[in-house]
Amino acid sequence: MFENENPNGSWLDEYQNDVRYGLKGKKIIEEISNFQKITIFESNRYGKALLLDNCWMTAEYQEKQYHECIVHPALCGSKEINKVLIIGGGDGGSARECLKYQELKNLDLIEIDKRVVELSQQYLSVIGGNCWKDQRLNLKLTNGINWVKDAKDNSYDVIIIDGSDPKGPAKGLFNKDFFKDCHRILKPDGVLGAQTESPESFEDIHINTVKMIKEVFKYADPLYGYVPIYPSGIWSWTFASIKKPRHLYPIISRANTISKTCQVWSPRWQRGGFDAIPANIERKLQQ
């Protein structure tokens, strides 16, 4: 993390693999929770932003590029969406997108760090919107890995893994045993969606995580899009299904309704995102 004071604000930077990514603005608050360092930063370009352990997580004016794209391929592909699980997602953005679906009856949001939720509600309320007041949302401040391990078989129609980078409290979300438990608790006609890092800035992590999911699920495919505040701007999400590749084929009536509420996601965008796999990444996934 590097800050250079000047009259127009400070540069707040994330360092990854000898590359620096930064935004100019001012720090609002920074604290150490029981799990990680949490920073709220008001950027000149993208509004208020959240950082965990010095890594950009989300920002007000570009968060839809992430949250729409981790949620809708899964919820538009699953046969039913009565019961949905989100692991992580303490900023509320993924929950907000899930709760757009009237068919959804129960949304379990499992966040390990209550301060992420509290600070997001206080400073980033535009991201979560009204999700925190929705009676369908069940917020549990506990360990998501243990929650999945203890859940009953075939418990959920959709599982969204909206964790941070594979370090600190989120490290266990990039583990094969964790994905095996997700497979066990996912209904046969359901869909799993997970953030799987950047194929450019974190190629090894991306390759290893996608391969891991492919080893556990019969059908799994990475989808690629852009998130400006993330290293390199290129990001990925991987979607997986059990009986058939439901994540590749959105239910049209559901997708047409939801896409009208979105700034980025649409069935057409989704097709392009799955097709956008870089040739070198595709070859490495086949090795």
Curated annotation (Swiss-Prot):
GO biological process, one term: spermidine biosynthetic process
Entry-linked PROSITE patterns: PABS_1, PABS_2
Recorded name of the encoding gene: speE
Function: Catalyzes the irreversible transfer of a propylamine group from the amino donor S-adenosylmethioninamine (decarboxy-AdoMet) to putrescine (1,4-diaminobutane) to yield spermidine.
Family matches, as Gene3D superfamilies: Spermidine synthase, tetramerisation domain, Vaccinia Virus protein VP39
Broad enzyme group: transferase
One Gene Ontology CC term in the entry: cytoplasm
Entry protein name: Polyamine aminopropyltransferase
UniProt similarity note: Belongs to the spermidine/spermine synthase family.
Domain PABS span(s) in chain numbering: 9-242
Residues binding S-methyl-5'-thioadenosine: 36, 111, 143-144, 169
E.C. numbers: 2.5.1.16
